[in-house]
UniProtKB/Swiss-Prot annotation:
Outcome when changing A84Q: Depending on subunit
Protein's name according to its UniProt entry: Hemocyanin
Outcome recorded upon mutating E444K: Depending on subunit
Known glycosylation sites: N167
Binding site for Cu cation A: H194, H198, H224
A matching Pfam family: Hemocyanin_M
Disulfide bonds: C483-C502, C562-C609
GO molecular function: metal ion binding; oxidoreductase activity; oxygen carrier activity
Length: 657
């Protein structure tokens, strides 16, 4: 008999906990557990002797929790507290069965959105969740990813019992310039990357939950910087200028009509073009946002921040950007949560509520108040360009790297070549909408799918020739960036202008033997990207087969869904092609890491998502060596371990199956 805590049984449990989340549990065993288990009957099953479970049960019995069949937003303080309470209960469970029993119990009694978020964060962070692949959120809460028109057709198909696949278009029309890049912000894989990163690094995380999230503040900067740089690369690919930053004293130029509805709560609010920022009741005044920004800029200019107890902390040192990231977000890691104020989180609330700032029309939260939907709104990228420029102000205060800072003595990059074609195209992708529609008892499910177009690229391989003149093996870090060569007007960019627009393509470690080394690296092995997640149907089928067959299940290749979709590694480019500089920097791996030459594959997406419960593997600043200003390109040209090659990316306009 296979133990109930093996991967197959755990995957089976999670599948059934998340299936048709707005309806009672279908699995008979879990359904019985939900109605017979008492979370506080035996408190020895928890690491905290049931303190969290008692608190949550008290709130539940006093009817002080958010009702079921109601919208949930992480930016709503009270709802976030409830989610954190449930997460704490699950996180304190000593064994999988206890976590599973609690999850079944609270699934039937708490708000569905709070439950899903808490379960996802628990599986991601708890050791008990190792080996489990969380189903793609676009199949669990499809309303957050799917246009209303498609959801309506899915309901119609269900009611008439007719199978159907419905094409989902990007919201808007060609009259709207922003429509040209809607495929980026509205890509369901990019939405998943964004929401999952914020589950991997929650702004409400406290180390009392079990461990420290290493370099969380710096990763907050780097992940959003890369999203913004990638968005700008897509704009260049569509004859558009880079996105402009948001200004609190200016209008919000682009409106947005989400064409999406909550499962319960009505339509997502719309925002017309050229809206003036308004004070938002219960969130902030416009003046508060300007004050917060000024306080942060003052800290950068002074080179220090003031902690809660009044002492000053120097930010003009290597981990300064880490401290700044925690303050700008702001997270529980902030050195002073009350001063200067929460710029990022409050800004999301401000933008989300501009359609109904005083609550006159009882509108639900806007798309900016959910990490799942935020990147759909063009104002998301304006907001992050604005914050990115604040971070740049900080990094520009550091002295540029010198020849000695950059060199890897005795190592030279002799040649960079690409095997294969750098070709992008759009393909089609189907996902099931079975969980979007309601089911009665004994009513058969109907095969209903949404069909979306997604950016993709042909696979390619980097061939990098590196010579090691040291007459002994060397451990090396290989860093690969893609940098634009010119702006939208065809004006050539120097390296200092281009560096902030560069896309991180890969970062990995390798051993250099004495003499000539040929490093071959496939695009699909990038530490920046993740493959497509298995569909919910596939996860259910594999888990059921493993449980029934009594064998285990290994889905470790898909365990993390934080990372840029691997098909979006390259920017779209144009049919006539666009030239980019491919930069390869080979740096001293012994200096870059803790020096242990063990497994440095790190399985997947460590570049932008780190490694759970461990130190970030690279000691260098994120973005090194391009994160500091470069007043003279010749410093880079003068070191042998950094080289660049001109490459051309071509877009094939033919839609592929």
């Amino acid at each position: 008999d296979v133990h109930s805590s093996d991967n197959a049984h755990k995957q089976h449990d999670v599948n059934h906990l998340l299936d048709k989340i707005y309806e009672p549990i279908k699995d008979e065993k879990l359904h019985n557990t939900a109605h017979t288990f008492n979370p506080v009957a035996d408190t020895s099953i928890y690491g905290d002797d049931g303190a969290a479970a008692k608190t949550l049960m008290q709130k539940l019995n006093d009817h002080r929790l958010l009702e079921e069949h109601h919208w949930f937003s992480l930016f709503n303080t009270r709802q976030r507290e409830e989610l954190a309470m449930l997460f704490t209960v699950l996180n304190q469970c000593k064994e999988w069965d206890f976590l599973n029993n609690n999850a079944a119990f609270f699934r039937e009694r708490m708000n569905e959105g709070e439950f899903v978020y808490a379960l996802y964060v628990s599986v991601i962070h708890s050791k008990l969740g190792d080996g489990i692949v969380l189903p793609p959120l676009y199949q669990i809460t499809p309303h957050m990813f799917t246009n209303s028109e498609v959801i309506d057709k899915a309901y119609s198909a269900k009611m008439t019992h007719k199978e159907g696949t419905f094409n989902m278009s990007f919201t808007g029309t060609q009259k709207n310039r922003e429509q040209r890049v809607a495929y980026f912000g509205q890509d369901i894989g990019m939405n998943i990357h964004h929401v999952t990163w914020h589950m991997d690094f929650p702004f409400w995380w406290d180390d009392s939950y079990g461990y420290h999230l290493d370099r969380k503040g710096e990763l907050f900067f780097w992940v959003h910087h890369q999203l913004t740089a990638r968005f700008d690369a897509e704009r260049f690919s569509n004859w558009m200028d880079p996105v402009d930053e948001l200004h609190w004293d200016d209008i919000i130029h682009e409106g947005f009509a989400p064409h999406a509805s909550y499962k319960y709560g009505g339509e997502f609010p719309t925002r017309p073009d050229n809206t003036h920022f308004k004070n938002v009741d219960g969130v902030a005044r416009v003046r508060d946002m300007e004050i917060t920004e000024n306080r942060i800029r003052d800290a950068i200019a002074h080179g220090y921040i003031t902690a809660t107890d009044g002492h000053t902390i120097d930010i003009r040192q290597p981990n300064g950007i880490e401290l700044l990231g925690d303050i700008i977000e702001s997270s529980m890691y902030s050195s002073n949560p009350h001063y200067p104020g929460s710029l990022h989180n409050t800004a999301h609330g401000m933008l989300g509520r501009q359609g109904d700032p005083h609550g006159k029309f009882n509108m639900p939260p806007g798309v900016m108040e959910h990490f799942e939907t935020a990147t759909r709104d063009p104002s998301f990228f304006r907001l992050h360009k604005y914050m990115d420029n604040i971070f740049k102000e900080h990094t520009d205060s550091f002295p540029p790297y010198t020849h000695e800072d950059l060199e890897f003595p005795g190592v030279s990059v002799d040649n960079i070549a690409i095997e294969g074609h750098l070709t992008t195209f759009f393909d089609q992708f189907k996902y099931s909408l079975v969980n979007a529609v309601d089911s009665g008892e004994n009513v058969e499910d109907v095969e209903i799918y949404a069909n979306v177009h997604r950016l993709n690229h042909e696979e390619f391989t980097y061939d990098i020739e590196v010579r090691n003149h040291n007459e002994e093996d060397k451990f090396a870090t290989v860093r690969i960036f893609l940098c634009p060569t010119e702006d939208n007007n065809g004006i050539t960019l120097n390296l200092d202008e281009a560096r902030w627009l560069c896309l991180e393509l890969d970062k990995f470690w390798t051993k250099l033997g004495d003499g000539k080394n040929l490093i071959e690296r496939s695009s699909k092995d990038s530490s920046v990207t993740v493959p497509d997640m298995p569909s919910f149907e596939s996860l259910k089928k594999q888990a059921d087969e493993a449980v029934n067959g009594g064998h285990d299940l290994d889905l470790s290749a898909y365990e993390r869904s934080c990372g840029i979709p691997d098909r979006m590694l390259l920017p779209k480019s144009k049919p006539q092609g666009m030239e980019f500089n491919l930069y390869v920097a080979v740096t001293d791996g012994d200096k870059d890491t803790d020096g242990s030459h063990g497994d440095h594959d790190h399985h997947g997406t460590h570049a932008q998502c780190g490694i759970h419960g461990e130190l970030y593997p690279d000691h260098r600043p994120l973005g090194y060596p391009l994160e500091r200003r470069i007043p003279d390109d010749r410093v880079f040209d003068g070191v042998s371990n950094i080289k660049h090659a001109l490459v051309k990316i071509v877009h094939d306009p033919e839609l592929r199956a």
